[in-house]
Amino acid sequence: MLRQIIGQAKKHPSLIPLFVFIGTGATGATLYLLRLALFNPDVCWDKSKPEPWNKLGPNDQYKFYSVNVDYSKLKKERPDF
């Protein structure tokens, strides 16, 4: 398959940006899914620990992007179970 892509790129150089953008998008999507699977507290791979989200403290950042929140200054607002 890679040989076909390289062959098409040699025959039609105008397709090179298309291949670059598709490859970049596929790589970014794969890395984002890997990040969600490994670092998201809602995903539980180990069945012996059924609720991993209860171990997160109020200072843990688990969002991908937060605009104006400084997690180091947050107070604990939830009860202990």
Swiss-Prot record:
Keywords assigned by UniProt, alphabetized: Acetylation, Electron transport, Membrane, Mitochondrion, Mitochondrion inner membrane, Phosphoprotein, Respiratory chain, Transmembrane, Transmembrane helix, Transport
Residue ranges that the UniProt entry lists as topological domain Mitochondrial intermembrane: 38-81
Cross-referenced InterPro entries: B12D (IPR010530)
Pfam families cross-referenced by the UniProt entry: B12D
Chief localization: mitochondrion
Membrane spanning residue stretches: 15-37
GO cellular component assignments: mitochondrial inner membrane; respiratory chain complex IV
Keyword Flavoprotein tagged: no
Membrane topology label: Single-pass membrane protein
N6-acetyllysine: residues bearing it: 10
Compartments where found: Mitochondrion inner membrane
Residues in the Mitochondrial matrix compartment per record: 1-14
GO MF annotation, one: protein-containing complex binding
Subunit structure: Component of the cytochrome c oxidase (complex IV, CIV), a multisubunit enzyme composed of 14 subunits. The complex is composed of a catalytic core of 3 subunits MT-CO1, MT-CO2 and MT-CO3, encoded in the mitochondrial DNA, and 11 supernumerary subunits COX4I, COX5A, COX5B, COX6A, COX6B, COX6C, COX7A, COX7B, COX7C, COX8 and NDUFA4, which are encoded in the nuclear genome.
Functional summary from the UniProt entry: Component of the cytochrome c oxidase, the last enzyme in the mitochondrial electron transport chain which drives oxidative phosphorylation. The respiratory chain contains 3 multisubunit complexes succinate dehydrogenase (complex II, CII), ubiquinol-cytochrome c oxidoreductase (cytochrome b-c1 complex, complex III, CIII) and cytochrome c oxidase (complex IV, CIV), that cooperate to transfer electrons derived from NADH and succinate to molecular oxygen, creating an electrochemical gradient over the inner membrane that drives transmembrane transport and the ATP synthase.
Family affiliation: Belongs to the complex IV NDUFA4 subunit family.
Protein name per its UniProtKB record: Cytochrome c oxidase subunit NDUFA4
Underlying gene: NDUFA4
